[in-house]
Amino acid sequence: MSTQTVDVVRSVYANFAKGEIEAVLAVLAPALEWVESPHDFLPHRGTHRTPAAVAGKVFGMVMATFDEFAVVPELFHDAGDTVVVEGRSVGTTKQGRRLDAAACWVWTVRDGLVVANHNYHDTDAWRTALLG
């Protein structure tokens, strides 16, 4: 079991929840693979390869789309350098539509830094929240 790896991932969720984005970015490797669903209706879709891209194209786009947004981790599965997190993405869009989507995040951590994050979402819930 890699407590340090799980702790790094837990810190991402804790700092995101507190709005401490710089602390989240501090544990991202300079070159990483952050993969979001490729669906056209998602403002943060695609693969992002730097902390700056994650900040702008993921966090920035989500915050521009939602009045309230949170990721809620429920279960952490430790697999050495990989941590699988089950949870939910929840929020209210600027149009007043609610999001409550099941999610699974697969993290890879090396030397205390996130080198990969692959996100799996209930895309129907996202589509409904974003498009009505």
How should each PLM-predicted stretch be described?
Residues 1-4, 59-132:
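A beta-strand edge to alpha-helix "cap/lid" segment located at domain peripheries
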Residues 20, 33, 122-123:
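Poly-acidic low-complexity segments
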Residues 9-12, 24-25, 32, 54-55, ...:
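Hydrophobic pocket/interface hotspot
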Residues 1-30, 130-132:
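Short, low-complexity N-terminal intrinsically disordered segments enriched in polar/charged residues
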